[in-house]
Amino acid sequence: MRCPFCQHDDSRVLDSRVCEDGTAIRRRRQCPMCERRFTTIERMQMTVHKRNGIEEPFSRDKVIRGVRNACKGRPVTDADLALLGQRVEDGLRARGVAEIPSEEIGLAILGPLRELDSIAYLRFASVYLNYNTIEDFATEIDRLRDESSDKTKSSSRKRLSKQDEPLF
């Protein structure tokens, strides 16, 4: 690593630590020429392949900006969006692939967004999945209702089974 002070081509690593929830490594370095110390942060760079052939670095902020538009007027906080962005990035990094098609990023957003807010999910999915007709919306709404009723039935069963348990 080149020294930022004297531009010498080499440096010595004094200390390495995992940081940023395990997604980066912080290294403390020292230049053998000027003996000044500096810190570097290293992380795996994910590259996004867009439909038009352009490649660009993955940006969690760009994911959050795209989802924020779908969440306008909904009870979704900045903290909720930050967590969604983290979940999407973690899911993509877990695949262990450095180059990601942009379509996969959209698909990775859909699951966490569905859990966060169903209306925001419908808004995002309508653009991302290219809904063209009212039937497309109706099909997706029916799917969301089915999932919601399945969750309600499951939680009701859990409550009923807990009521059957003895108190002592």
Swiss-Prot record:
GO terms for biological process: negative regulation of DNA-templated transcription. A zinc finger (unnamed) spans 3-34. It comes from the Bacteria. Pfam families: ATP-cone, Zn_ribbon_NrdR. Residues 145-168 are annotated as: Disordered. The keyword rRNA-binding does not apply. The keyword Metal-binding applies. Keywords: ATP-binding, DNA-binding, Metal-binding, Nucleotide-binding, Repressor, Transcription, Transcription regulation, Zinc, Zinc-finger. Signal peptide: none annotated. Binds 1 zinc ion. Its cofactor is Zn(2+). Residues 46-136 form the ATP-cone domain. One of its GO terms (molecular function) is ATP binding. Belongs to the NrdR family. This is Transcriptional repressor NrdR. The gene is nrdR.
